[in-house]
Amino acid sequence: PDMRSAEEVIAYLEKLRLIIQYLGASDCKLNEGSMRADVNLSVREAGAAEFGTRTEMKNLNSFKAIARAIEGERARQIELIEEGKKVVQETRRWDDNKESSHAMRSKEDAQDYRYFPEPDLVPVVISDEWIERVKARQPEMRDEKLIRYQEEFGLPKYDAEILTGDKSFADLFEAAAAICGKPKKVSNWIMTETIRLLKENEMDPDQIRFSPEHLAKLVDLADAGSVTNTVAKEVFEKVFKEDIDPEAYVKEKGLLTVN
């Protein structure tokens, strides 16, 4: 893909990550290597027809690192050109701690790799019928969920964007909402307390260990006024960390509100 800014690159990668996650092909964790992205970058003067000399940037372990590397390399190349120096076609390694890069090796052109056709591989012919069969079997994708959450559950667009922005959130939301029948309240608990605790514990959404059943029970307890909001949040921390049954816990600890 041909892109012109760090923002455009990150938007593309985030979209690609969601597609792959929803297909179940990978969890797409850059820091663990289940998703990789190298960046080839060049600059040219405004109005110039030809691209400048490109470099390839490696060791990019997060979307934030990719954005910083793009901005850093763009600035480095512009500085070289303005000083009358040449940009060397090379592979560079990004150091996110120092927010700078250093040369690894010279970057060859395609002909230098000496590519040639593999004689033992037969041509693969993909029919329109095969494509349609694959389409029919693929799971519901993020964009489809985004619309459905607003239409079926009556969620605001903001809620739907957050919940579908990670498949783990979407799966948790749908399962819990199906149990308690309170989609907006389930959404609120995921978007506030769940995300807060994930950040505090430096966890990713796919590391959530509590069950949808226990989240649904807590939503019911809070909605019925059986526990105060303060108690509900305290109990949820136990649910988040230990996946306890909130209903049994509040009864055992005498935390039910007396009307």
Give short role names for the model-derived ranges.
Residues 1-259:
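Charged, compositionally biased, marginally structured helical/coil segments
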